[in-house]
């Protein structure tokens, strides 16, 4: 399970709270987005500005880390630095699936991973040329190309020779799993590229993906991707008291 921006259905996306909860819900990896501040700090934020997550129009590339760190996000959270997320991932034994949202963040991200001696990470982007540059620089981490709707994944990723093809086809149709054909899976295997699937919460779509030889599935609700832990008699080990009442009102 790859927690999309952390457990973002329950906590403000891309925050330490969202990543901590993702670990508690059983996610093996956290997907996160990185950008570079005006003074060269790699910050974890999806959008270029903080308008959507904080109601503040401050733009990441135009602001210093000191300015960004003072902004309170919705849910009483703050924008973390990449180093902070790495430290939390090390403590919780979690992996990082890092999406580059700015070209200038690429080499900084790679350098920080090396400096922190963090091994369990993937670096990806929709921009094949950014990933190609990391490949040419002999980046030691697995590289991923995110594939938008309507393009051939193999043609789109040719320039970068990625290790992973990440299909972002959630909104391609009401049954996007049907686009993950046997031919697509077979070709990706032949070319030595693993498959990662978009963020998904629809049970019927997840059932359609069940059994496919894919590396991972992203979700805002990572717990739905995890099998129930069971004892030797097949009895669930976990019983939720009044439901998952730390996420929603009890007994509802």
What does each model-found stretch correspond to?
Residues 1-252:
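Phosphate-group recognition and catalysis centered on beta-loop-alpha active-site segments
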């Amino acid at each position: 399970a790859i927690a999309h921006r952390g457990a973002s259905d329950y906590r403000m996306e891309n925050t330490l709270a969202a990543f901590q909860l993702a670990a508690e819900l059983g996610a093996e990896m956290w997907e996160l987005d990185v950008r570079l501040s005006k003074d060269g700090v790699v910050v974890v934020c999806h959008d270029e500005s903080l308008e959507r997550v904080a109601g503040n129009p401050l733009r990441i590339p135009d602001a210093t880390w000191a300015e960004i760190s003072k902004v309170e996000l919705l849910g009483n959270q703050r924008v973390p630095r990449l180093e902070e997320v790495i430290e939390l991932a090390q403590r919780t034994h979690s992996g990082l699936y890092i999406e580059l949202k700015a070209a200038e963040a690429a080499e900084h991200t790679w350098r920080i991973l090396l400096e922190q001696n963090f091994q369990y990470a993937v670096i990806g982007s929709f921009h094949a040329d950014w990933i190609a540059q990391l490949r040419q620089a002999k980046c030691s981490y697995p590289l991923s190309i995110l594939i938008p709707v309507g393009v051939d994944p193999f043609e789109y990723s040719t320039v970068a020779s990625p290790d992973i093809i990440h299909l972002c086809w959630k909104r391609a149709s009401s049954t996007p799993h049907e686009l993950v054909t046997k031919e697509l899976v077979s070709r990706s295997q032949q070319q030595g590229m693993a498959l990662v699937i978009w963020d998904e919460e629809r049970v019927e779509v997840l059932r359609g993906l069940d059994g496919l030889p894919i590396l991972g599935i992203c979700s805002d609700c990572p717990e739905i991707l995890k099998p129930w832990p069971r004892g030797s008699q097949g009895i669930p080990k976990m019983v939720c008291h009044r439901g998952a009442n730390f996420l929603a009102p009890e007994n509802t």
